[in-house]
Amino acid sequence: MTGQVRLSFDGPIATITNDNAEKHNAFDDAMDEALFDILGELRRHPEVRAVIWRGEGKSFSSGRDVGSIGVVKVSLSHHELMRRAHRGIQQLWELDAPVIVACKGWVMGGSFQRALLCDIRVAAEGTRFRLPELNYGVIPDTGGVGVLYEMCGPGVVSDLVLTGRVMDAEEALGHGIVSRIVPEAELDATVHEIAQQIAGAPAVAVKMARAVIRHLAVPQLRSAMADEMIYQTFVNRSDDIAEMRAASVEQREPHYTGS
């Protein structure tokens, strides 16, 4: 069954649900497109005062569906695909309503980065965060590294990106990546309570407070994402990525040259 991304409304609160539970809500191109359409639709609903983003099953999202990596179904260059993806997710910044992410299970790769572009993140106990992109011969390219740099500093970001190690919920709380940790059974209720509190506040005050925070963050994020687009395009055309793919097909150790 193909994964889906669903949108539902409960009064002034909208909920986005990642629904590919058999694959820990890993995203493919169709789910990306559905997500971007949903963000566009939310921009047309000014009555929405808060947005919850959650996942069905055991995880928020394990990132990219590895079965779809390298599978191109549209006639666009890699650079154009990245630009489309950036434009799609940057719609988060254009929403008047804050977005609260319910983190649980695995929060990985591009989905981890997308969560970092949102306003508030709450983690269930046992949540694990990871940026495994280098293992697949690519770099993180969804803007989250810029957010992590501000939160954690260059040392922790380098450790996470270059080793792909797992960060647990307690460490994430210590760095301010999440603002609360709750038992998993209480996660949905907790984020809904936060959404209700925000939705009950004066809407213009929420909008302006969010605008001030975004004014501080977005310029750096745009710059970071522009760099990611350039460097990821270079990586995609590099000798090393070609060698990685050839070695995988030929079942041998790769020999990288750094070019």
Locate the predicted segments by residue.
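Amphipathic alpha-helical segments at domain termini/boundaries
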Residues: 1-19, 23, 165-199, 207-216, ...
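Conserved CoA-thioester-binding segment of acyl-CoA-metabolizing enzymes
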Residues: 1-56, 90
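Beta-strand-connecting loop/turn residues
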Residues: 12-13, 58, 127, 230
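Terminal peptide-recognition signature
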Residues: 16, 20, 35, 53, ...
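Glycine- (often His-adjacent) and acidic-residue-rich active-site loop
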Residues: 40, 47, 55-91, 107, ...
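Crotonase-fold acyl-CoA enzyme core
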Residues: 90-204, 229, 237-238, 242-243
